[in-house]
């Protein structure tokens, strides 16, 4: 078809460019996440820790049940009445102690973990944080550091939590994974941007199609790797934390938006690769 205008190629290239734009936009949302707090960046976090029950007594039910079982071995109206008062009294006392400990500690009700920082807030609003740490390129998810900081700020004291060697090693691995994930997200966005820039030379017979396909391919790969690292890292982190700090009763959940954005961004990049490739084939040559 020579160097003339090819409407079919233009159509595929145009749709592919829209996919690249979508991928780049979603990539930006993943990278910025908790560093901004307007409506576009709400609830974009990797995991959220719920600390509303951190002071609950883990064996509350066991204590009450053991008391009930002991009293059930006896008979009589007086014993039945006494059992009722003990059950209710134990529950009320525990709830009162939990609330007083919560009020004194001034710990937040939740923490959300982002790419550059963490945020915390109250149970009355799980969307808008009351505080976010300063975004930093050296930040990585360390739950014990977060708790230490919150407790020290609330009490004005200096508390240091000592970890077993295997847990400390796990945090170092987690640190490396967080850094790698951050690098993959940034590289993915850079290649999305390079893909958009290379559109201006896409009319060139060889280098134009080559750059479009190569840049969109690497944008897809890096974004997908970032998403996989994020899912694997934080699923393992949740499993280990729930196993090792079960006594603290801190439920942890994965975020939804950031993983959806990550995989959709990679899918958009993949769609762009395919569309660019098909468009180039209609010109009678392949960039590969």
Curated annotation (Swiss-Prot):
Cytoplasmic side: 1-11, 207-210, 279-288
Membrane association type: Multi-pass membrane protein
Disulfide feature: none
Record topological domains on the Extracellular side: 33-185, 232-257
Keyword Cell membrane among UniProt keywords: yes
Keywords (A to Z) from UniProt: Cell membrane, Glycoprotein, Golgi apparatus, Membrane, Transmembrane, Transmembrane helix
Gene Ontology cellular component terms for the protein in this record: cell cortex of cell tip; cell division site; cell tip; Golgi apparatus; Golgi membrane; plasma membrane; plasma membrane raft
Compartments, as annotated in UniProt: Golgi apparatus membrane; Cell membrane; Cell tip
Keyword S-adenosyl-L-methionine: no
GO terms of biological process kind: fungal-type cell wall organization
Transmembrane segments: 12-32, 186-206, 211-231, 258-278
Annotated glycosylation sites: 33, 50, 59, 66, 122, 153, 160
InterPro entries recorded: SUR7/Rim9-like_fungi (IPR009571), SUR7_domain (IPR052413)
Main localisation: Golgi
Function: Contributes to the wild-type cellular response to nitrogen stress through signaling pathways that regulate the expression of genes involved in amino acid biosynthesis. Required for wild-type filamentous growth, cell growth, and cell-cell adhesion.
Family, similarity comment: Belongs to the SUR7 family.
PANTHER family: CELL MEMBRANE PROTEIN YLR413W-RELATED (PTHR28019:SF2)
Name of this chain's protein: SUR7 family protein pun1
Organism: Schizosaccharomyces pombe (strain 972 / ATCC 24843)
Gene (name only): pun1
């Amino acid at each position: 078809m020579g160097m003339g205008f090819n409407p079919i190629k233009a159509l595929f290239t145009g749709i592919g460019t829209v996919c690249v734009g979508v991928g780049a936009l979603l990539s930006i949302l993943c990278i910025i996440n908790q560093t901004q707090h307007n409506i576009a960046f709400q609830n974009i976090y990797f995991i959220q820790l719920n600390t509303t029950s951190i002071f609950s007594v883990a064996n509350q039910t066991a204590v009450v049940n053991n008391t009930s079982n002991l009293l059930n071995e006896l008979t009589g109206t007086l014993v039945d009445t006494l059992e009722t008062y003990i059950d209710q009294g134990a529950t009320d006392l525990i709830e009162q102690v939990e609330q007083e400990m919560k009020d004194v500690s001034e710990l937040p009700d939740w923490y959300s973990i982002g790419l550059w920082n963490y945020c915390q807030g109250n149970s009355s609003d799980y969307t808008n944080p009351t505080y976010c740490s300063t975004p930093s390129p050296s930040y990585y998810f360390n739950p014990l550091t977060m708790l230490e900081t919150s407790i020290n700020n609330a009490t004005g004291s200096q508390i240091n939590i000592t970890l077993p060697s295997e847990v400390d090693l796990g945090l170092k691995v987690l640190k490396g994974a967080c850094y790698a994930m951050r690098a993959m997200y940034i590289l993915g966005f850079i290649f999305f941007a390079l893909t958009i820039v290379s559109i201006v030379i896409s009319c060139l017979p060889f280098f134009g199609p080559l750059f479009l396909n190569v840049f969109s391919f690497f944008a897809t790969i890096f974004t997908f790797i970032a998403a996989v690292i994020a899912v694997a890292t934080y699923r393992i982190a949740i499993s280990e934390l729930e196993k090792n700090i079960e006594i603290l009763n801190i439920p942890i959940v994965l975020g939804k938006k950031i993983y959806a954005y990550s995989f959709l961004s990679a899918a958009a990049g993949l769609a762009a690769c395919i569309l660019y490739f098909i468009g180039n084939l209609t010109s009678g040559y392949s960039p590969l």
